[in-house]
């Protein structure tokens, strides 16, 4: 289990999280929900070690075993769909590429470059690349942005089967209702009562 206790995060004079506490179960999918700008992405960045809280503690995270899907896809325009996966997989695991593409419903796109992908396809590729890391914790920032809902729900079922906990950000009601746990963030400065 991951425990966050009394996290306070500020940027200059602006406090985004104010003594915020919560737990992430050791398995399953936990969703973060709330309006834009309330601290969801900041919270993921703190858990990934990319931002330092001003105060508070995070327990139960092994930094090198954490995978973060950024809010933007960060695809390399000169690399094919397949190469985006082989770039993060050791050569001994390249045989997994077809299954990884199937997970993201990208079969047949192996030799396609990012410029030829739709926004939803690019997002699914970024998600497949993140999941290929086989982490102990997945932090997913809007993993289904631009993905049609029926496809997102199919991929969602595969996320729920992962052996590691997933903490994701979503605004989609159907995704939130399918989560094992939902943490509502209602606006800065976010605080636990």
Residue ranges: model-predicted function:
Residues 127:
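Hydrophobic anchor residue at the start of the ABC signature
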Residues 138-142:
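Catalytic Walker B motif of ABC-type/P-loop ATPase nucleotide-binding domains
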Residues 33-35:
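The feature captures the beta-strand-to-loop junction immediately N-terminal to the Walker
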Residues 94-109:
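Conserved ABC ATPase "signature" region
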Residues 79-96:
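Q-loop/switch helix immediately C-terminal to the Walker
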Residues 113-121:
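Conserved ABC ATPase signature
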Residues 48:
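Helix-to-loop junction immediately C-terminal to a conserved catalytic motif
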């Amino acid at each position: 289990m991951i425990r966050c206790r009394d996290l306070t995060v500020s940027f200059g004079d602006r406090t985004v999280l104010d003594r915020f506490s919560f737990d992430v179960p050791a398995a399953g999918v936990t969703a973060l929900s709330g309006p834009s700008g309330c601290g969801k992405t900041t919270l993921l960045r703190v858990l990934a070690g990319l931002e330092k809280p001003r105060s508070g503690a995070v327990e139960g995270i092994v930094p090198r075993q954490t995978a973060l899907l950024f809010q933007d896809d960060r695809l390399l325009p000169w690399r094919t769909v397949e190469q985006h996966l082989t770039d993060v997989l050791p050569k001994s695991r390249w045989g997994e590429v077809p299954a990884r593409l199937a997970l993201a419903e990208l079969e047949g796109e192996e030799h396609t470059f990012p410029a030829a992908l739709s926004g939803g396809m690019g997002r699914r590729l970024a998600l497949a690349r993140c999941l290929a890391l086989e982490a102990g914790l997945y932090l997913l920032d809007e993993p289904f942005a631009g993905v049609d809902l029926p496809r997102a729900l199919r991929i969602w079922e595969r996320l729920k089967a992962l052996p590691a906990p997933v903490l994701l950000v979503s605004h989609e009601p159907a995704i939130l209702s399918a989560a094992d746990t939902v943490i509502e963030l209602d606006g800065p400065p976010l605080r636990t009562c």
